[in-house]
Amino acid sequence: MSLPIVLVDGERTAGVPATDSSVLRGDGCFEAIRAYAGKPFRVDAHLDRLERSAAALDLPVPDRSLIASWIREVAEEGGDCLVRVVVTRGP
């Protein structure tokens, strides 16, 4: 089993701060994107849904192209994997 690849705001890190609203209140939304041979599946559809979910919760979302680049980075390294994108309000 390989270790997970974790990016927080595009930076490799072990996780989110304990003061993050997702930890304290469960405040956030996510998308899970399957990748096959390092290629994420239907990224645009997933990002559309993520943006709708975040808007419904009034959560700030990083630039779409930036999120897509992070997804591609993780998928390329992970190969056949699941890429989970989580949006929170932050600390």
Regions found by a protein language model. Give the residues of each.
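Conserved alpha/beta cores of soluble small-molecule-handling proteins
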Residues: M1-P91
